[in-house]
Amino acid sequence: MTISINEYSDLNNLAFGLGQDVSQDLKELVKVASIFMPDSKIHKWLIDTRLEEVVTDLNLRYELKSVITNTPISVTWKQLTGTRTKREANSLVQAVFPGQCSRLAIVDWAAKNYVSVAVAFGLLKFHRADKTFTISEIGIQAVKLYDSEELAELDKFLYERLLEYPYAAWLIRLLGNQPSKQFSKFDLGEHFGFIDELGFETAPIEIFLNGLAQAEIDGDKTAAQKIKSNFESTSDKYMRWLAGVLVTAGLATSTTKKVTHTYKNRKFELTLGTVYQITAKGLTALKEVNGKSRYPRSRKRVMWEFLATKDKEAIAKKTSRSLMLKHLTEKKNPIQAEVIATLINTDYPTLEITPEEVIDDCIGLNRIGIEILIDGDKLTLNDKLFDFEIPVQKDVVLEKSDIEKFKNQLRTELTNIDHSYLKGIDIASKKKTSNVENTEFEAISTKIFTDELGFSGKHLGGSNKPDGLLWDDDCAIILDSKAYSEGFPLTASHTDAMGRYLRQFTERKEEIKPTWWDIAPEHLDNTYFAYVSGSFSGNYKEQLQKFRQDTNHLGGALEFVKLLLLANNYKTQKMSKKEVKKSILDYNISYEEYAPLLAEIE
């Protein structure tokens, strides 16, 4: 196989790979490829009647008809996917699929997702030089089978393409490794994507179930329905579609699952939603994906566009990860992470790749379906890949942002805790965060205390509750986590809320709802508080000191990085639990072990 590097005057910002609002029946994808096949059923239908029915702009209708009567048929992104309209279609893919309710055709968002998946399955080719799309040989074969109504052969053909689709390979492996387990969309999202990167976050299942339980307590059916409809991240939506594809292909089953959930010392029977479990056919597919028994391993179809989400670091990340795959395919395996980092930095020194970053990215590549064996610092690419291209922009230097440089420095420091926590730095530095990201920052902060620092506890969140409650044999800590890119100012309104939580925890009055404190033991010797943020601003030290004096409670302000380094020091036994607590309760946030790192990038 060949992974080639080619220069372009500029790069696209298109996303290919996963889909939302796309049919879970892969035969529907063939309709997209049919647009490019002269005399196919879909092609004839578009020209003869369909475009007349759904494209109301006469000039645009003429343009779309003209483009698919040219030879060869080459179509732009806009001609394929269009823009938002009231009810009519203004693109070819919109026109192919019927709309819902009063719409004549699907919306542009759904059309973009159809194209994204059609390209990822190899049915269409994307030409970066002129940013146009044409049909591939695979697409031609699929359309011929579709038009001749050889549906059994078409299903077999698409099944083979599905096993080449790395995201499907990832999900088949995940389900197949625990064949007796039923996976919710939350479980799937938790195991998907690059570990320290925004865009792969999943909504916490605990918050989802707590919300449903509270709605039941309140007798609010509207709130419960809203939670069921809207409580999911972008990653969760992609997982739901991908799992549905496996179900349609017979590789997994789906069912609605009820769970018993404890909330406020009460047990609730709640509907978790759809869960997925592998089938016998799915276990056979696992052998084909991995090349076990008599089955040859399926070759995986990868694109540069698969290798990062659409953030400001995406181009550098896609390129560095593509280069990792290039060196893994070209050099004798196993190969050390340090060697790969050196090879990349030799050609692209401004990427400043570290061995730790290589290993973290290889974990992420596994989590999108490209299997790489990681044995310490030795890496072996187990999957065979189809040829693909690494596009680079002419005269543009790829550089990391200060945040990414800082994260790389931290990777070398965080030797004993999971690097997925580094995602918290990205969330804390964003100027505008989503509700899911804010909730995830709260959950990450709480998890560091419970999984790394030896506390018991729970992420709470929601109205009239702190973000987290932690405890051990000696004390309780009430946690407030804030992702403020300009620094958390710690105003009087924030300390007023914390003061209320401290009183509620101490008094434990059952008439006050919600009784969030019930999860912690009574009669602990001490009750503390802690604020966690990316940074703090304003006169937070004075405010914090005054609050400590007014409430007679000890507490501190921790920059998120300080929390990470405390956890690592505790796990490496450089600090005792007593020393950790002392540092948490120190209202001076400066921390000698990370101050030099901060100074290096200022």
From Swiss-Prot:
Its EC number is 3.1.21.4. InterPro entries: FokI_cleavage_dom, FokI_D1, FokI_D2, FokI_dom_1_2, Restrct_endonuc-II-like, WH-like_DNA-bd_sf, WH_DNA-bd_sf. The keyword Hydrolase applies. It is an enzyme of class 3 (hydrolase). It comes from Streptococcus sanguinis. One of its GO terms (molecular function) is DNA binding. The lineage of its organism: Bacteria, Bacillati, Bacillota, Bacilli, Lactobacillales. Gene3D superfamilies: 3.40.91.30, Foki Restriction Endonuclease, Chain A, domain 1, Winged helix-like DNA-binding domain superfamily/Winged helix DNA-binding domain. It holds the Pfam family FokI_D1. It catalyses: Endonucleolytic cleavage of DNA to give specific double-stranded fragments with terminal 5'-phosphates. This is Type II restriction enzyme StsI. CDD domains: FokI_N, FokI_nuclease-like. GO terms for biological process: DNA restriction-modification system. Keywords: Endonuclease, Hydrolase, Nuclease, Restriction system.
